[in-house]
């Protein structure tokens, strides 16, 4: 196994099965963040992740973290919070502000560089990248953005400025996603936060099988049209 240098003249990627074991999933470097290359990457289970000043690095880790939306873990405390929630959740209302929020909410720095922001804004303009926003009155207090692949949604990042805001975004999105034919959410690499919400790890080859099938399955018509999302409270 060796790290592959991508060409600027071809958007092809090597097989994810050739990714390094350490660091886990590192597959290639270089290339660019053009819409065509990004879409090619997501179609093959690959995503960019690199620090400011580093070359573009492309990853496909094994195992892969995923969330089956019907398995979202709603804790008792979160259920009580949601039943009296002061938040309003929207879809694709403020993509630029969500990705900016994800880039700026970490004190220790971010991997979301200006180039990443510009690249995903272009994907959003083309209808491939989407955002879920959480509002308290008129203030944006949390959100998620990611890339759609048919009935699979590749979550990229989330942020929260007030209590349970990003959890609310994911909870409401999961319910709406299921209702419109969504099957799986890619969480890339498992962490304590996503694990607490129900994410699990599966083998990369199993993720790639799911991706190949689900990206061919369209969601219900006009699912990504900007609108307010609702979840019945119980």
UniProtKB/Swiss-Prot annotation:
Catalytic activity: N-terminal L-lysyl-[protein] + L-leucyl-tRNA(Leu) = N-terminal L-leucyl-L-lysyl-[protein] + tRNA(Leu) + H(+); N-terminal L-arginyl-[protein] + L-leucyl-tRNA(Leu) = N-terminal L-leucyl-L-arginyl-[protein] + tRNA(Leu) + H(+); L-phenylalanyl-tRNA(Phe) + an N-terminal L-alpha-aminoacyl-[protein] = an N-terminal L-phenylalanyl-L-alpha-aminoacyl-[protein] + tRNA(Phe)
Record keyword Cytoplasm present: yes
EC number: 2.3.2.6
Function: Functions in the N-end rule pathway of protein degradation where it conjugates Leu, Phe and, less efficiently, Met from aminoacyl-tRNAs to the N-termini of proteins containing an N-terminal arginine or lysine.
Subcellular localization: Cytoplasm
Keyword annotations: Acyltransferase, Cytoplasm, Transferase
Gene3D superfamilies referenced in this protein's UniProt entry, alphabetically: Leucyl/phenylalanyl-tRNA-protein transferase, C-terminal domain, Leucyl/phenylalanyl-tRNA-protein transferase, N-terminal domain
GO aspect biological process, one term: protein catabolic process
Stated family: Belongs to the L/F-transferase family.
Name assigned to this protein: Leucyl/phenylalanyl-tRNA--protein transferase
Molecular function as annotated in GO: leucyl-tRNA--protein transferase activity
Major localisation: cytoplasm
GO cellular component terms given for this protein: cytoplasm
Signal peptide: none
Class of enzymatic activity (EC top level): transferase
Superkingdom: Bacteria
Organism field: Salmonella dublin (strain CT_02021853)
